[in-house]
Amino acid sequence: MLTNKEIKQLIWEKADNVASKLGLEIFDILIKGSNKNKILEVVIDKADGYVSIGDCERFSKAFDPWLDEIDLFDKSYELVVSSPGLDRKLRGKADYERFKGKLAKFILKGKETKHPVVIGYIDEILEDQIKITEKDSGKLFNIDLNEIDKANLEIEL
């Protein structure tokens, strides 16, 4: 019997293969629920834009037969294919570069930080810093990349 970590790795490898054939990427894989009601959520992404419902459907149709064939779970499972969403998590330098000019929320590490949360536009990505223009004040922030605890896009209304 495989561990959840081993199952996730096996699923990731196959999902990545299927996704790349469809011009997609794997953003995350989550295994949720109890042994009786497993939910496998595959979060897909698209390097050149946003994921559509059609993208999710195409991935699901291409990936589901392999899951049924390999029979990784003891009981039945539900496959959920989704996108990272409009307020997607930003996972580092490559994402900051990709979403340059977009509004994002940065939660910083450390209790000593004057501004533990900064919401602003991603201006420039340097070797070990990111430059942000705060949304409300227009103030420029230089944030060390290693000081970022969490970051995600913000929905601009």
From Swiss-Prot:
GO terms (BP aspect): ribosomal small subunit assembly; translation
Keywords: Cytoplasm, Ribosome biogenesis
GO cellular component terms listed in the entry, alphabetical order: cytosol
InterPro entries: Ribosome_maturation_RimP, RimP_C, RimP_C_sf, RimP_N, RimP_N_sf
Domain of life according to the entry: Bacteria
Protein's UniProt keywords contain Cytoplasm: yes
The keyword Ligase appears for this protein: no
Pfam families xrefs: DUF150_C, RimP_N
Predominant subcellular localization, coarse grouping: cytoplasm
Locations listed in the record: Cytoplasm
PANTHER family attached to this UniProt entry: RIBOSOME MATURATION FACTOR RIMP
Job of this protein: Required for maturation of 30S ribosomal subunits.
Family assignment from sequence similarity: Belongs to the RimP family.
Protein known as: Ribosome maturation factor RimP
Source organism (scientific name): Petrotoga mobilis (strain DSM 10674 / SJ95)
Gene, per the UniProt record: rimP
